[in-house]
A protein has these predicted regions:
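Polar, S/T/G-rich
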Residues: 1-192
């Protein structure tokens, strides 16, 4: 398939044409300590490796090493049931005037039963925040909520959560006046 377009002085790259191409992104492996109820942890990417104010999209991966509710007493002793854990993900930023802002992006959690690791990546776009405010610096706050079930005399819970990584991406905002552009995709299997 060949797609052509005549160049002009104000052209920008057709977003649909390059939709399958990744943006510029950097990922930081976190490997956080266990998130404790009501004790937020803050995460960011070093500004030395990435121009943070240019960030358009952020992903954060949260995991659990297992989720279960084990009955310790009674006729059902030893039964393994599902449990849950709840947490919030907030986007915090400082504007050019030094004013701190906070916006809750997710109020969510995990529910179920799993004996091994389970991870989920949450992503959110901050381009509208950038359009409404200036962003000089930012961080992500994750808080395990006190509404999460806790172990008791009759039930032993496993519902610890951790932050595995964060990723910041810059969407391509390309301008090439009077220029033709070509994109290609090569299947990785061709390089076996």
């Amino acid at each position: 398939t060949v797609i052509t377009k005549n160049g002009d002085a104000t052209q920008v790259v057709d977003a649909d044409f390059f939709a399958e191409y990744p943006s510029a992104a950097t990922t930081k492996d976190i490997g956080s300590a266990e998130l404790l109820e009501g004790e937020p942890q803050y995460f960011t990417i070093s500004s030395g490796t990435f121009e943070k104010r240019e960030t358009d999209y952020i992903k954060i991966t949260i995991s659990t090493t297992g989720m279960s509710a084990i009955t310790k007493k009674g006729d059902n002793k030893g039964d393994i049931n599902e449990t849950s854990v709840y947490f919030t993900i907030d986007f915090n930023w400082v504007d050019n005037s030094g004013v701190h802002h906070n916006r809750e992006m997710f109020d969510t959690g995990f529910q179920g039963k799993v004996s091994g690791k389970y991870a989920h990546t949450f992503g959110f776009n901050i381009e509208q925040i950038k359009a409404d405010h200036t962003i000089n610096d930012w961080s992500i706050k994750v808080t395990k909520l006190t509404a999460s079930p806790q172990s008791s005399d009759s039930v032993e819970l496993q519902n610890a959560i951790y932050v595995d990584s964060i990723e910041a991406a810059i969407a391509d905002k390309l301008e090439y006046p009077y220029t033709a552009y070509v994109g290609g995709v090569i299947d990785a299997e061709a390089f076996s």
